[in-house]
Amino acid sequence: MPVIASRISPQSEAFKANAAHLLAQVEKFRSFERAVIAHSSQQAERFAKRGQLLPRERVARLLDHGAPFLELSTLAGFGMHDDDGASRVMGGGSIVGIGVVSGKRVLVLASDSAIKGGAISPMGLKKSLRAQEIAKENKLPLIYLVESGGANLLYQSEMFVEGGRF
């Protein structure tokens, strides 16, 4: 395959400015991802008192030790519904990703019961449906860890599953 010639100069000021801007945006994105984890982790003491693991701990115990986990749709519903995009970043109320269980690549979907009791928001539902599509398209087994209060009743009217999608 021939190499595609480029006229981009990594030493140019424009390139350096664009790279710096991009890295700043990536860090901003990563800070929102960390906020999702922090929001969920605030419930650690409550879960420990009940003898429960936090949802991310359950996912970690499910996966093969040391195997990679590619989390997907980390900011689903960002700035929507009860997610304010600042102090309450919820990631769609679930953890979705591709990992390895017993040596097999799988898609894991875990409701995050540390966020609103695992209640499903409209974007959380879309995140779950998209995870199911990804599993089907890639012939991945789907492991679903559920601990949920059901639909978030404030947004129940927005959560009708589109025809042929469930």
Where are these regions (language model features)?
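Terminal-region recognition feature
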Residues: 1-166
